Amino acid sequence: MNFNPIFIPIVLSLLGLLYMFFKAKWVKKQDPGNEKMVSISSAIKKGALAFLNAEYRLLLFFVVIASVALFGISLVVETTSWMIIPAFVVGAIFSGLAGNIGMRIATDANSRTTQAARTSLPKALNVAFGGGTVMGLGVAGLAVLGLSLFFMFFINQFMNDGGSFYDNMTVVLEALAGFSLGAESIALFARVGGGIYTKAADVGADLVGKVEAGIPEDDPRNPATIADNVGDNVGDVAGMGADLFGSYVATVLASMVLGNYIIKDMSDYASEQFSDPFGGMGPILLPLFIAGIGIIASIIGTLFIRIKNNEAKEAQVQASLNTGNIISILITLFSCWFLIDYLLPDTINGMKFFGEGTRDIPSQNIFYSTIVGLAVGYLISAFTEYYTALGKQPVLNIVQNSSTGAATNIIAGLATGMKSTFSSVILFALAIWGAYELGGFYGVAISASAMMATTAMQLAIDAFGPISDNAGGVAEMSELPKEVRERTDILDSVGNTTAATGKGFAIASAALTALALFAAYVTFTGIDGINIFKADVLAALFIGGMIPVIFSALAMESVGKAAMKMVQEVRRQFKEIPGILEGKAKPDYEKCVEISTNAALKEMLLPGIITIVTPVVIGFAMGPEALGSYMAGVAVSGVLWAIFQNNAGGAWDNAKKSFEAGVEINGKIEKKAVSYTHLRAHETARNLVC
C-alpha cells in the first residue's frame, strides 16, 4: 500500500489542534479570581457570545443564498463541480468556528490574567499569552485540516475521470476554492461587524466617561465599559481570527493553483506528463506542507515566551514576544529547505514568465523566495512596532505636538500614519520583485505561504493584546490594588503594539495573498496582460482604487451613527440614574451592549455587499481583463489605506498611554488629567481612523 503524502499536513494540523486543547484546558484551570471578577468576566463573555450568535444567524442567510448561486454556476461552468457547495459551507463554518474559539478562550482568560497579575507579572504574561496561543493554533489547525481533507477527498473524486492531469486538477482546485470562498466571506462580515461594534463602544466609553465625566478607563461607573470590553473580543479576537483564517486559506490555495500551472509548464517542456514520487503533485503539495510545518514551528516558538523579573517593563515583555516570533520564523525557514528539496525537482524546467518566455529555475530559488516571505513577515511587524510602540520617536512626536492642542495632535497622528506607508510599501515592492525574479509567480505565492506559515504565532501575539486589555478592565472594575492595574497596564501597553503589529501582519498577508490570487487569476483566464491604454481597463483600475476609500467611508459613517447613539445613552444614564457617578447605583450595561450589537449587525451589510457585488458586476459587464485591472486597483489602494489607518490609530493609542503614565512636555510632567483638549484630540482622532 502506497503512503499518501497528504496525510502529513493532516497529522501536523491535528497535532496543532491537540496542543490547542491542552493549552485551553491549562488556561481554564487557572484561578479566575474573586466573585466580582468572575461576574464581570461572565458579563463580557455573555455580551460577546450574544453578538456572535446574532451575527452568525444573519450570515446563515448569506451562506444559503451564496450556495444557491454556486449551484447555478456549477450547472453552466464546465470546470466547476457542484461539490464546491459543501466546501463553501464548511469553509464558512470553519471560519466562524476559528473566531468563536478565539473569542471564548479570550473571555475565559481575562479574569484569570487579572488574578495572575495579583501574584506576579510573569504569571500574568503566561496566562494572557496562553489564551492567545489557543486562538492562533485554532485558526491555523482548522485551516490546514480543512484544506487537506477536502483536497484528499476531491483528488479521489476527480483525478480518475479520464481527462488530462491538468484538467482534472483544475476541477479539484476549483472545488477546493469553495472552502476559501466560504472562509473569506465570513471573514469580511466578521471583521467589519466586529470593528463597528468595537469602535462604537470605544467612543461612548471614552468620550463621555473619560473626557466629560473625568472617570478612569474601565471604571465600573461607566455604562459603556462592558460593551467596550466586549468589543475588544468581537473585533480584535473573533474578527481578526476569521480575517487571518481567510487570508491563510486563500494564500495556500493560490499557491496550489500556481503549482498546477508549474506542473503543466514542466510537462509541456518535456512533452510528457511530469512525474515525481508524490503522484506528480509535489509543487501543489508544497504550500500545504509549509503551512503544516509552520504550526509545529509556532508551537515551539511559544515555549520561549516568558519573563522572569517581576519588575520587568514593556521593553522586556516585547523582547520576549519577539524572541518567540524569531524562533518560529527560523524553524520554518530551516524546514522549508528540506521540504523544497523533498517535494520539488532539482530544476523546474520551462517555467513561464509573462512577456519573457520561459526559464529553467533551480529549486533553491524557491527556497530563497521563502526567505523573502519570512523576512517580510518579520520586517512589517518591526516597522509597525517602530511607528506605534511606547517610547519610539513617532509616538513621542505625537505627545509633544499635543502640547499646543487638539489640532496639532491630529496633524501629527495623521502624518505618522501617512509616513509609515513609505517603508512598508518599499518592502512589499522589493519582496514582489525579488520573489518574482527568483521563481516567477510561483515564487511569489510560495513566499506568501512561507510568511503565512507562522500565522499561529502571529495570532497568539495579536490576541494577547485584547486579553491584556480586558484584564486591565477587570482589575479596574473589581477595584483591585494599584499594583495589579500597573502590571496589567504593562501588558496592555505591549498589547497595543502587538495589536498594531498583528494588523500589520494581516495587511502584509493580504498584500502578498492578493498578488498570489492575482497571478492565479491571470494564469487561469489566459489573458496576456492588463493593458491600461484600453478605456474600460483604465476605468476599472480607477473603480478598484476607489473601493477601499468608499469602504472606509461607509465603515466610519457606521461607527459615527452607532457612537452617537452610545454617547447619548451614556449621557442619559448619568443624568437619569441617580448615584451612578458616586458609585451608589449600578449602570445599565446591557443597554449599551444592545446598542453596539444592533448597530454592528445593521451597518456591516452595505460595505460587505459592495465588496462582494462590485467585482461580479465588473467581470460580467467589462470582461476578465478589466476585472484584473479592478483587482490591481483594490490591492494597491487597500494596502495604502490599511497601513495608514492601522499605524495612525496604534500611535494615537500609545500616545494616550504615555499621558496616563506621565510624560514630560516642555520640562513639565503631565499625566492623564493633562487637559481636556489632549484627551479629546486623541480620542476623537483615534476612533476616527481606527
Regions found by a protein language model. Name each.
Residues M1-R680, R686-V689:
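Hydrophobic packing and interface segments
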